[in-house]
Every structure is written in C-alpha cells, then in structure tokens.
C-alpha cells in the first residue's frame, strides 16, 4: 500500500546558520525530509534541529565545498541516501574579507558560488528527474546591480578586490546567468531552475570575519530583516502561489531583469567545462 502524502525531499546546502538554517526549520515544520550539506555542524543547542536529526527527518552531511574530493564524497552519500529529490536549494556561500583562492586555484567566490552550485546540480540531476517537484533554487543577490563591468576573465582572475561589490557580486551574477541559460535544456526533463535574491538579511555572526564593507555592518544590524525573511523568499519561490518560469531571477518573489544576460552562454560553457575537465577527472 502506498503511503498517504509521503514526505517530500529537499537538499539544502549552507543550512547550518542564517537563511539556510531558517529554511531548514520551515521545511521541517512542513514535514519535509531534508538532506543538509554543510561545511559546519548544526548548532548543538537547537532543539528543533537536534530532534529532527535524531528522528531521521533531517540528515546532515559535511564537506569542504571547494575541495573536489570532499565534495564528491558528500554527493556520493546523498545519492546513496535517496533516489529522488524534489527541490535542491543551492544556498551555500559567503563573502570573504580578502582575495582568496580555492584548492583548484580559482577565485574563491567564483568557485563556491558559481561553479560548485553547477557541479551539485549536475551530480544530482538524475535524482531531481525522479522527484515530483523537480526544482533547483540557487541563492543569488542583487549586489551585482552595482557592477559597472562584467566578464569571465575578471570573474576567474580578478585584478583587484572589493568587499561585497567585487568578486562576491560578480559570482552571484554569474550564478544567475548560468541558471537562466541552462533552464531551457533542463525543462526538457521537467526540471525547473530559478535564482532568487533573498533580500537584505542580518546574517552577521560574532565568531566570523565579515566580508562586508564597514559601512554596511551597522545598517545590517539596524535595518536588515531576520534571516527567516530570506528563507521565506526561497521557500515561496517553489511553494508560493505563483509558478515562475524556469530560468527566472526573482526579487521579492517577482521576475526581474538580469544585466549582462548576453554573457550567459559564455558563463554556462565555462562552468560546464570546469565540471567535465576538472571535477569529473579529479
């Protein structure tokens, strides 16, 4: 006998704090089954999270996202734990205070926030095809609206560094560009791709060096929303009353125009090249 209303399954990256943690709480409340892929462990004093871990409704896998051996091991674990995925939330990210590089030698924001979400999407593609909702939500940002120029060479090898409005913003734009570019091909298999700006959220943590400009911090503390607001925007992109077209970039749950959209094919070609030549052959 088939179960009535079986649990839907979501994979959420970057869910041990901030927006991702709030999204995890929301989906647990809605009776989703969640596989969390994080660099850090969940808070030990969060009773809701720890209860879900104990019951098996929430499963936690840890990995260094920008180390391909570590990432591959984690994705293998996910595939071994579920045959189908309803929604993939590519939420892991962050902004650094200095220019840094990944284990593969690429600028860290580009690796973590542009390339790795594509790798995760490709590696979980067959599981998404088997899901009922077949949706990918990539967490983006409107920070890229401040960019005056954008190109692939600068994205991979920036000559200078600027907090928030430099490599961070460029990598989020590139994420939304490949999302839009890959959407039509994915729809042939019924998979819908979205990139979503979660808005301004107070995600400051006292134990972490901030990649924000100094003048943003007091504004964030005073005026930015609790991370549950951003989590709700990610949640509603999939489960809200409006069904958005695949490839859309959403701001306040409405489709918005992407700048530099003519470079989408170049960005998609590059991340796919990295996936095939670097990730698959590592």
Question: How should these model regions be labeled?
Answer:
Residues 91-97:
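Conserved NAD(P)H cofactor-binding loop of Rossmann-fold oxidoreductase domains
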């Amino acid at each position: 006998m088939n179960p009535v209303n079986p649990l839907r399954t979501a994979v959420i990256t970057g869910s041990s704090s901030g927006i991702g943690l709030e999204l995890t709480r929301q989906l647990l409340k809605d009776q989703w089954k969640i596989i969390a892929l994080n660099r850090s462990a969940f808070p030990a004093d969060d009773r809701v999270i720890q209860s879900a871990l104990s019951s098996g409704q929430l499963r936690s896998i840890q990995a260094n996202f920008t180390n391909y051996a570590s990432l591959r091991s984690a994705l293998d674990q996910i595939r071994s734990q579920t045959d189908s995925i309803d929604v993939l939330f590519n939420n892991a990210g962050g902004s650094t205070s200095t220019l840094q590089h990944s284990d593969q030698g690429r600028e860290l924001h580009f690796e973590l926030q542009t390339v790795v979400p594509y790798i995760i999407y490709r590696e979980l593609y067959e599981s998404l095809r088997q899901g009922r909702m077949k949706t990918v939500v990539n967490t983006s940002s409107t920070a890229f609206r401040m960019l005056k120029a954008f190109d692939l060479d600068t994205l991979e090898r920036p000559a200078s560094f600027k907090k928030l409005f430099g490599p961070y913003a460029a990598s989020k734009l590139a994420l939304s560009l490949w999302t839009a570019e890959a959407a039509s091909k994915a729809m042939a298999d019924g998979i819908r791709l979205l990139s979503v700006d979660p808005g301004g959220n107070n995600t400051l943590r006292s134990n972490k060096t901030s990649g924000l400009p100094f003048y943003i911090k007091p504004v964030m503390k005073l005026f930015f929303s609790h991370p549950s607001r951003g989590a709700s925007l990610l949640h509603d992109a999939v489960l809200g009353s409006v069904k958005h077209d695949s490839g859309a970039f959403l701001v306040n749950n409405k489709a918005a125009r992407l700048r530099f959209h003519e470079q989408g094919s170049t960005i998609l070609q590059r991340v796919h090249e990295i996936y095939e030549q670097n990730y698959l052959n590592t």
